[in-house]
Amino acid sequence: MRTAVAAFLLAVLSAVALGQSQSVVWEGVMEAARKAYEQGRYEEAEKQLKSALQGAEGFEPRDPRLATTLEQIITVYRTQGKMALAEPHYHRLLGIQEGTWGPLDLRLVPTLNGLGMVYASARQYEEAESAYQRALTIREKALGDAHPDVATSLENLAGLYGSAAKFEQAALFYGRALDIREKSQGPEHLNVATTLESMAGLYRDQGKYALAEPLYRRALAIREKAWGPEHSDLVPTLDSLAWVCYGQRKFPEAEPLYWRSLVIWEKAVGADHPTVATALDNLAGVYVAEELFDKAEPLYRRALSIREKSALVSFDKLASLYAGEKKYPEAEQLYKQALAIAEKMNEPVELGMVLQKYAELLRLLERGEEAARLEARVKDIHAKLAAERPPEKKKPKH
């Protein structure tokens, strides 16, 4: 903290020498923090914001720039998952906002919800409940009992109760939220689908699959109507519905749902994406449960092949990085692992690529004989691929 103070004071002194105000310095530091945050340099953004916060202390107690600085440093901490560091800033921000707007102003709700989330992440459920409950009370008084934002606050509390294993209270609050959303936004609104899924997830986590199933089915119908039957955002709902069907041993109903997820992912991300491997595993699991092992095996094999290809790419990239950093032993170990995978895959193109890269590393290490053996294998692979390639048709002469 002393470093941040010193940095800001130095900036102020420099600014004074240049005829600039403390306000201009604060704006410059905040801009530097914003750029660092947008570039993903969170530690630098944090450093700049600590400096800006020290500078903002010199403004009037209710100067909005102090609250703005607190909001930004909270955002940086949350992005990094540093919830414990965000907590005291939330309390201070809330105190400033209450002093400015009063204790029942709607503008307090985002800060209360953020504070509730910080407590919930630390499993401080009573403190989280207090923050969420206060946000709910403010919304009910300002907006009425039937406003969609009230439903959001009810859902926050329901999720908290679910995490605290207070399942009856959670179900009650989800039910209230669902009733509000259906009446205020219509029974086919996407927010209704979200609430249905949240309630279904509560039942699923308790093993109450029969109660979860109709909620997931209704949520799926709403989303299909809004997005069409092949949208990739349908997959979580399809998978959840398939899972509760599987949990009830309704395997013939789970199978087509997992098939749909597989087809959607193949179209959305390509047949060799790791996500497709997960979809294949899910479908294969249904066949195993039905003892249809001849159907499960090719799916598991395909999933394994996808993961091997993905691992091969990762090994190659990391090995190339190590080679560029002259960490040759580490690079060689990775190329050996990549080579073992490529040999197993029986994919000549991938095998040739790994052999060539490994040979290049061996040349760098002045191990020419070993490199030559690998290069000879690469030539053999290329020759076989060329022989298998169909001859090009000659273009007719005009």
Question: Each predicted region: which residue ranges?
Answer:
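N-terminal leader/linker segments that initiate helical-solenoid repeat arrays
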Residues: 17-47
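Short coil/turn linkers that connect adjacent helices within long alpha-helical scaffolds
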Residues: 58-61, 99-103, 137, 141-145, ...
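Conserved alpha-helical positions within TPR/SEL1-like repeat arrays
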Residues: 27-38, 64-79, 106-121, 148-163, ...
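Bacterial N-terminal signal peptides
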Residues: 6-16
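Terminal, low-structured helical/coil segments at or just beyond the last alpha-helical repeat
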Residues: 356-398
